[in-house]
C-alpha cells in the first residue's frame, strides 16, 4: 500500500510538472521552429505568423509519464523480480495501473493528451542507479548494476524462455499506450531459422504485444568482410577490427562501442536464446 501510494504521489508530481512545462512551451515563437511550422508538422503551425506564440498548436502533442526499473523495484520489495514471482508481477501491474489513473485524471482536468510510456532510458538507466547508489548504498539486485532494467521488462539476466518472457510482459502493453516494446534476444545462429522466428512473431501477436522486436548480433570484419557472430577476433583473418551492430532497444544505433557504459553492461548481461 505504501509503495502504491508513493507511485500515485510521484505520478501526480510528474503530471503537474508536465503541465507547467507545457504552459511555458506555449509561449515559444513560431519562428523558433521553422521546419516544424513551415511543414505543418505540428497541426496548425503553418498558419502562424513567425512572431506568434505557438500556443494551442502544442495541444495535439503528448505529455508522457514514463517509468523504468520495475524489476528492480520488485526486488527491493520482495527479493525477486516479476519474471517468476506472481506476487511481484501483480504489484508491478497495479503500480502501472495507478500511473494510468493519474494520467486519466489529468486528461480530464486539463483536456490534454496525458499518456503512460514504458521508458527505454538509454541515458537515464545508468544515471539513476548512480544517484540511488549514493543515496541508499549498494543493494543486491537493485542498485548493484550499472543500469536499471527498462520499464516493465523482465530482468535481462533472467533465465526465462522466450515464450514466458513474452507472456509476462505482454499485459503491460495495453496499459502503456504512450509507447512500449518487448524484445527477445537471439544468438547468431537463430537468425538462420526462419520457422523459429515466425513462431516468435506468432506468439507476440497472440499475446497482444503492441511492438515486438527480435534482436540478434550482426558482426562484420572490417578487414576481410566476414559476417557472423565474432567474439574477439575474426575467425577468418584474426583481425580485431570488428563492427558489432546491436539493437539498443527498439532501433539500431551503430557500433556497440558508441553505446554508453550502462547500456553496454546491459547488452552484455542479456540472455541470448538459441
Residue ranges and their predicted role:
Residues 1-274:
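Long, C-terminal-biased catalytic regions of enzyme "large/alpha" subunits
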